[in-house]
Amino acid sequence: MKNISDNAIEFRGVAYKASPDRTVLADLNFVVERGETLMLLGRSGSGKTTVLRLINRLLIPSSGDVCVDGKRSGDWNPIQLRRRIGYAIQDVGLFPHYTVWQNVALVPKLERWDARRVSDRVEEVLELVGLPGRDFAGRYPDQLSGGQRQRVGLARALAAEPSFLLMDEPFGALDPLTRAEIQGEFKKLQQKLKKTVVFVTHDVGEALTLGDRIALLEAGRLRTIDVPDNFLQSSDAVAQMYVSVYRTGQQALPR
């Protein structure tokens, strides 16, 4: 089918209703450019995670179109679409009875890569996230710190060479020092890899640090979308609240 968009991801007039009388998202219009990190900023219940689920076709829009890699999400085979996407979430989701190596190798094996390619890729991504295979490949998740588990989760998300990364507050459960360290590592990694990333957060500082652009959601609507410097100067009332919180040293609005 002919591509209908040159953008990596595009939302065109998208609405999503969880039930006839409950609108979760309304009239979303935005694009995610190739190689961009777009931060979805908002409180709990603002619709951020629903956006991710619309991208990977776990949900279908009630109206409008979600386009991924030039095709409407409904035109994608769901399995093929999801195999193009890497996922990193707050709870990591590592299999406790699998070693680090086995956790990272899981998706490439499901993709039926040959054994040598799997082994080489696991070693490569573990090095990328700062966990050399010689030291960490044989460990189990309960033998790792919280920061190390998040690094393994990121390595697993990258292992099958996805076109896109969907990240749902992946660093939210970490202590502030570890979180800042991993944010810095992720930013350097993204500068090198240039994946297309949609990253959910409720932390305005994280959005300003990691994002090429910030999309602010409030009650299912897009309030503003802009680069960090412009976001700090936004005239939008909700954006101004987030900027005020940031400048007073807090992390986020009440959830």
Predicted regions and their residues:
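Conserved ABC ATPase "signature" region
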Residues: 116-135, 188
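Conserved catalytic motifs of ABC-family nucleotide-binding domains
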Residues: 161
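Conserved ABC ATPase signature
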Residues: 139-144, 148
